[in-house]
Every structure is written in C-alpha cells, then in structure tokens.
C-alpha cells in the first residue's frame, strides 16, 4: 500500500468541492486513499484499478474519524449528489453485505447542463427493528 494519494488540482478548485462539508471532505479523502492507481502505457495516464470495488463501512468510518453514522450517510449522499463518488453496489449492513463505491468524474460538470445527476437509492425494505433492551 502506498503512502501517496493523488488529488487533481481541478478537484479542490471546483464549484462542487466548495459545496462539500468538512465531514464530506474527510470521507472523500478516505475514498481517494483507498484507490489503487495503475499506470497505463508509457504516458502519464493513470486509472483506478479497483473502481467500483472500494469498500468503506460505517463501522470503519465511525471508529477512525469518530463521525456519527448519520453524518457518514449524509456525506455519502452529498458526495454522490455532487459527482465525486458513485455507488456500484448497495449493501445490506445487517447481512454483512458491504456497499461498494467507485470514484466518479461527474464533479467536473457540476453546475453545467452536461452534469449527470445521481442520488443514493433509499432503503425501503421493511426490516424488523432490533429488540429493545429491558
């Protein structure tokens, strides 16, 4: 695992980045740190090898950054809405099925007609509530 994380200059100067909350920036940086970058050909062209396979769980983020679960959820919503990440697989936390994420470039077109809007799919399952402790 590398000690280096690549962030494009355009990203932090973009209108989409300026709308991020502090918690969303922390979560975005954690996603970017989990990318596996590989060089393609002789040119300086890099691609994300594990795009769509990046896992970041509620348990990890709350332990590492002491961010509340609701804050993490709101950060995911904001990162998807502004075009920084996409959800490749919606996991079901109770079944130990983790969500998988991909780094997106949609943020480049944020505020333009070409911007593709996405949002996190809401969980409408009627899951039973955990039994209360008496």
Locate the predicted segments by residue.
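Short, amphipathic alpha-helical interaction segments positioned at domain boundaries
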Residues: 105-134
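A broadly tuned preference for mixed-charge, low-complexity surface segments
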Residues: 31-33, 79, 128-133
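A broad, structure-centric signal for solvent-exposed, well-ordered loop/edge residues
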Residues: 14, 18, 27, 63, ...
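Winged helix-turn-helix DNA-binding recognition segment
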Residues: 36-103
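Compositionally biased, intrinsically disordered low-complexity regions enriched in proline and serine
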Residues: 7, 18, 29, 58-59, ...
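Residue-level marker of intrinsically disordered, low-complexity segments enriched
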Residues: 2-5, 9, 65, 85, ...
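Short recognition helix of helix-turn-helix/winged-helix DNA-binding domains
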Residues: 1-58
